[in-house]
Amino acid sequence: MRLFLSLPVLVVVLLMILEGPGPAQGAPESVEASSGLDKLKEFGNNLEDKVREFFKRIKESDIPAKTRNWFSETLQKVKEKLRIES
């Protein structure tokens, strides 16, 4: 229930932040918007780099191979037990 209520609130807050300052605040909108977009673009680029590095580490690690081997060994053990019992 909390998630159901918090998602609309989060969307409204995000829209208010992205909307920028109102005209009464007197900040030049073009400079403010471009700096906000630059920050957002920089954040996106940083996030992309981190995600790529994360997946690269997973591909290079031996965790997938170990997991695959464990499943294969477990499946073989189950097959052997079924052959013995039948």
From Swiss-Prot:
Name the UniProt record assigns to this protein: Apolipoprotein C-I
Any one of the GO CC terms: high-density lipoprotein particle
Transmembrane domains' residue ranges: none
Superkingdom to which the source organism belongs: Eukaryota
Any GO MF annotation of the entry: phospholipase inhibitor activity
Organism classification: Eukaryota, Metazoa, Chordata, Craniata, Vertebrata
Function: Inhibitor of lipoprotein binding to the low density lipoprotein (LDL) receptor, LDL receptor-related protein, and very low density lipoprotein (VLDL) receptor. Associates with high density lipoproteins (HDL) and the triacylglycerol-rich lipoproteins in the plasma and makes up about 10% of the protein of the VLDL and 2% of that of HDL. Appears to interfere directly with fatty acid uptake and is also the major plasma inhibitor of cholesteryl ester transfer protein (CETP). Binds free fatty acids and reduces their intracellular esterification.
Predominant cellular place of this UniProt entry's protein: secreted
Keyword Heme: no
GO biological process entries: lipid transport; lipoprotein metabolic process; negative regulation of cholesterol transport; negative regulation of lipid catabolic process; negative regulation of very-low-density lipoprotein particle clearance; triglyceride metabolic process; very-low-density lipoprotein particle clearance
